[in-house]
């Protein structure tokens, strides 16, 4: 028989049988019957031979004739031992087992932890146990998942007996001092005990009474268990209203199914993995009629099935509330006043009657149900004292009465009348953020403070690690999925250019939040009478100035740090920063006035009605709810001034210059690059009216320092008369210029249209680099071309070809009055760059 199981059919083991197995007896039965799964007891054989529609949960193996199985194996392929399915494709067979039989393990690996013995066959493990562990009965099988491989690790219990909640196994007897429990506490009903009194004489007599006999056996076994737990110390603290926690554990396939004694044909096991049903049960275990109607439409299952499923879940988790308790718990839940209970273990024995259980068993609690980690063990020591070892979970063991009562009656000696003694609940931590509405995560809108925390973290890293996510969960009170979704959305928006999160915008958001909650927030350092600004010490002023140099809009953490160091109030710090920004604004305005600019940076509008992105950003920030709007304008004016000054010097900054601008302005590097690109495009259309002013200011600053170098580096100087006349003539009519006049332009040509522009020849090296940078953008000295004035052209010997092409392109642009990119720019750029 063993050779037949070595065919192409993979070895399959049900996980529900891994919990408790008497390995020796089951090995013998496996050899006798020739099945890949060890059977349980005599009653299971009888039920497998005559299956009933109402006992599907109790069926484990379907017995087939030997001839049928042999005929299928002769054809080749794979057959399922739990249903008539067969196929010749291994992938289809594996998919069938995973979908239809989730509790079946394919090709497990058996490991003996005592001897380091490893095998893939159950028969080999049985032979190993009979040879090396003769007479041993306390075997434990532990299920482990390793790299898509299911490992069943066998160990031997070192000592005495362990309290169990399973029905009597094949290897246990009535005189055992205890019943063994496995990795997961299970309640197996629907099985008859393998003694002569319980097994009926005829097969047809067993079918009608199997459920009632099994339930009676459940009650008697519970009485036996609770009688052995008499020495356990009872905890008299009554439990409060605690919501059930029905979250899917990672080992969902290992959780045993609870058989329903009543109406098993109506119980739909497909609802056990329905996320909608589980979420609804997590919210409240007693659904209203409206919720039942909604669940009926959402899950596409009959309402009667949903009612039975909810009743079964309450039965499974030991929940049985009176109507008054249901209303009270519902009010507390929606008022946000549910308090969690400390982890306790409560064993509450009750009076039991050995008679048969009446019909409404769904309204009573199971004898025992363990939630949380499935490694809780109650060990009964032979000395008489009972040691309780468990993980920090809440466990309640309540007796079951069979008088049709809604809640079990508890003896006064056991506990002083607890209101609801049969709740099994894992306490949840209290919510971090108070008054959180009980709405779906997608419907909740984030507050400004939550968005500020998220933006601050987004600036540090667009892909936060787990530690940062947990910190954001504690700070914002948002769920992990909400935080992940927010980061994903903003990464997409930043890549598309929809939003731009900068340090300045974050600082302004935090300032706005601080300003809105000043009147209702209590701080660690209360604000007393404000000091006068003149009374600040030198140390305080130095600390404030250092912070101002870093950022003119301090963050919340920076303000708290300044309060600790300077001993000033929050109002004083905010006022000082506001006054300091106003002082800086006035100085900036004075600089702009000295440059002859009567316009503000945010008011510069292009002739075609277009604004640069940075100007639009500054205009948008004007409308923000900031304490001092003028400070935001001047802050942007300072940034715009630095960018424009750099643009007047060179329109193609180097990477080092981009880094310097990012450090000086506080803007993101990508924003600066985009600003330069847009302004170069505007320069081609002739809409940069501010460029001439900034270039004049830049050249006037360089004029005083470069007079000597200008005289020293001047090689050939044409007279103003000749140079001016030839250049103006060439600008008016290039074709009329003869060869002699064009040769005069080769050594040195200087056109003077404005006496104040003589300083342009002051720094030849820098002027040449500026022209090379300008030629890359194809515009030359465009600010003067808009007014129709050409300041100068400096030419050295050896550049005749390049300069002639450049002069041709310039003359065409001057004549047409527009700024276009000439084809000769690509040729002139290398020549000028090499000369520079």
UniProtKB/Swiss-Prot annotation:
GO terms for biological process: mRNA catabolic process; negative regulation of DNA-templated transcription; negative regulation of neuron differentiation; negative regulation of transcription by RNA polymerase II; neuron differentiation; regulation of transcription by RNA polymerase II; retinal bipolar neuron differentiation; somatic stem cell population maintenance. It is found in: Nucleus. Residues 24-58, 168-210, 404-442, 700-836 are annotated as: Disordered. GO terms for cellular component: nucleus. There is a cross-link at residue 455 (Glycyl lysine isopeptide (Lys-Gly) (interchain with G-Cter in SUMO2)). Residues 195-358 are annotated as: Required for homodimerization. This is Zinc fingers and homeoboxes protein 2. It comes from the Eukaryota. InterPro entries: HD (IPR001356), Homeodomain-like_sf (IPR009057), ZHX_Znf_C2H2 (IPR041057), Znf_C2H2_sf (IPR036236), Znf_C2H2_type (IPR013087). Residues 27-77 are annotated as: Interaction with EFNB1. Residues 263-446 are annotated as: Required for repressor activity. Residues 263-497 are annotated as: Required for interaction with NFYA. Residues 42-58, 192-210, 700-709, 730-746 have a biased composition (Basic and acidic residues). Keywords: Differentiation, DNA-binding, Homeobox, Isopeptide bond, Metal-binding, Neurogenesis, Nucleus, Phosphoprotein, Repeat, Repressor, Transcription, Transcription regulation, Ubl conjugation, Zinc, Zinc-finger. Residues 263-324, 439-501, 530-591, 628-690 bind DNA. Homodimer (via homeobox domain 1). Heterodimer with ZHX1 (via homeobox domain 1). Heterodimer with ZHX3 (via homeobox domain 1). Heterodimerization with ZHX1 is not necessary for repressor activity. Interacts (via homeobox domain) with NFYA (via N-terminus). Interacts with EFNB1 intracellular domain peptide; the interaction enhances ZHX2 transcriptional repression activity. The modification Phosphoserine is found at residues 824, 826. Belongs to the ZHX family. A zinc finger (C2H2-type) spans 78-101, 110-133. Acts as a transcriptional repressor. Represses the promoter activity of the CDC25C gene stimulated by NFYA. May play a role in retinal development where it regulates the composition of bipolar cell populations, by promoting differentiation of bipolar OFF-type cells. In the brain, may promote maintenance and suppress differentiation of neural progenitor cells in the developing cortex. Residues 317-446 are annotated as: Required for nuclear localization. One of its GO terms (molecular function) is DNA binding. It holds the Pfam family zf_C2H2_ZHX.
């Amino acid at each position: 028989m063993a050779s037949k199981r070595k065919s192409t059919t993979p070895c399959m083991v049900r996980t529900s049988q891994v919990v408790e197995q008497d390995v020796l007896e089951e090995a013998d039965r496996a050899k006798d019957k020739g099945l890949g799964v060890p059977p349980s007891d005599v009653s299971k054989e009888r039920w497998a031979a005559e299956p009933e529609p109402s006992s599907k949960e109790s069926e484990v193996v379907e017995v087939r004739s030997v001839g049928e199985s042999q005929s299928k194996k002769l054809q080749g392929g794979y057959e399922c031992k739990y249903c008539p399915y067969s196929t010749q494709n291994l992938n289809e067979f594996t998919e069938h087992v995973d979908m239809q039989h989730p509790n079946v393990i394919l090709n497990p690996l058996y490991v003996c932890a005592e001897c380091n013995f490893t095998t893939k066959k159950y028969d080999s493990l049985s032979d190993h146990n009979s040879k090396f562990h003769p007479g041993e009965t306390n075997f434990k099988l532990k299920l482990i998942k390793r790299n898509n491989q299911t490992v069943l690790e066998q160990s031997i219990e070192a000592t005495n007996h362990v309290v169990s909640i399973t029905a009597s196994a094949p290897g246990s007897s009535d005189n055992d001092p205890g019943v063994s429990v496995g990795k997961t506490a299970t309640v197996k009903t629907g099985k008859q005990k393998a003694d002569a009194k319980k097994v009926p004489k005829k097969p047809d007599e067993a079918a009608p009474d199997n459920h009632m006999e099994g339930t009676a056996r459940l009650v008697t076994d519970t009485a036996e268990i609770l009688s052995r737990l008499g020495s356990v110390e009872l905890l008299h603290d009554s439990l409060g209203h605690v919501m059930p926690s029905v979250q899917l554990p990672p080992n969902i396939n290992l959780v045993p199914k609870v058989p329903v004694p009543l109406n098993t044909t109506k119980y739909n096991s497909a609802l056990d993995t329905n996320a909608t049903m589980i979420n609804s049960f997590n919210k409240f275990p007693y659904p209203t009629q409206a919720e039942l109607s909604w669940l009926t439409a959402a899950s596409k299952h009959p309402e009667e099935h949903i009612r039975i499923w909810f009743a079964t879940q309450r039965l499974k988790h030991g929940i049985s509330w009176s109507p008054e308790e249901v209303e009270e718990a519902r009010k507390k839940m929606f008022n946000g006043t549910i308090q969690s209970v400390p982890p306790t273990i409560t064993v509450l024995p009750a009076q039991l009657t050995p008679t048969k259980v009446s019909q409404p068993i769904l309204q009573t609690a199971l004898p025992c149900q363990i939630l949380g980690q499935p490694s809780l063990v109650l060990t009964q020591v032979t000395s008489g004292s009972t040691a309780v070892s468990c993980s920090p979970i809440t466990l309640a063991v309540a007796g079951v009465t069979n008088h049709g009562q809604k809640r079990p009656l508890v003896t006064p000696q056991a506990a002083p009348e607890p209101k609801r003694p049969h709740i099994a609940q894992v306490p949840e931590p209290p919510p971090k953020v108070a008054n959180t509405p009980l709405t779906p995560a997608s419907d909740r809108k984030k507050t400004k403070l939550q968005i500020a925390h998220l933006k601050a973290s987004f600036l540090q890293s667009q892909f936060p690690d787990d530690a940062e996510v947990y910190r954001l969960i504690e700070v914002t009170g948002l769920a992990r999925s909400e935080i992940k979704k927010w980061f994903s959305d903003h990464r997409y928006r930043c890549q598309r250019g929809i939003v731009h999160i900068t340090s300045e915008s974050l600082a302004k958001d935090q300032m706005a939040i601080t300003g809105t909650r000043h009147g209702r927030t209590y701080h660690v350092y209360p604000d007393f009478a404000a000091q006068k600004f003149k009374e600040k010490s030198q140390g305080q002023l130095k600390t404030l100035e250092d912070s101002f140099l870093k950022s003119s809009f301090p963050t919340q953490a920076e303000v708290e740090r300044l309060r600790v160091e300077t001993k000033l109030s929050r109002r004083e710090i905010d006022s000082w920063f506001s006054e300091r920004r106003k002082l800086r604004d006035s100085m900036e305005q004075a600089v702009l006035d000295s440059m002859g600019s009567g316009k503000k940076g945010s008011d510069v509008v292009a002739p075609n009605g277009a604004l640069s992105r940075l100007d639009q950003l500054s205009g948008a920030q004007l409308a923000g709810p900031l304490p001092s709007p003028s400070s935001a304008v001047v802050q942007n004016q300072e940034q715009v001034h630095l960018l424009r000054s750099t643009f007047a010097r060179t329109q193609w900054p180097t990477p080092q210059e981009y880094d310097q601008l990012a450090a000086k302005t506080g803007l993101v590097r990508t924003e600066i690059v985009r600003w330069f690109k847009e302004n170069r495009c505007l320069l081609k259309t002739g809409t940069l009216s501010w460029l001439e002013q900034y270039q004049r200011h830049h050249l006037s600053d360089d004029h005083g320092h470069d007079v000597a170098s200008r005289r020293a580096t001047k090689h050939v100087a044409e007279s103003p008369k000749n140079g001016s006349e030839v250049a103006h003539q060439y600008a008016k009519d290039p074709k009329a210029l003869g060869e002699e006049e064009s040769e005069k332009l080769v050594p040195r040509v200087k056109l003077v249209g404005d006496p104040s522009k003589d300083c342009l020849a002051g720094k030849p090296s820098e002027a040449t680099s500026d022209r090379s940078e300008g030629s890359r953008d194809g515009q030359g000295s465009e600010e003067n071309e808009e007014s129709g004035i050409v300041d100068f052209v400096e030419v050295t010997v050896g550049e005749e070809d390049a300069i002639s092409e450049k002069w041709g392109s310039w003359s065409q642009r001057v004549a047409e009055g527009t700024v276009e990119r000439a084809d000769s720019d690509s040729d002139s750029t290398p020549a000028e760059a090499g000369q520079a």
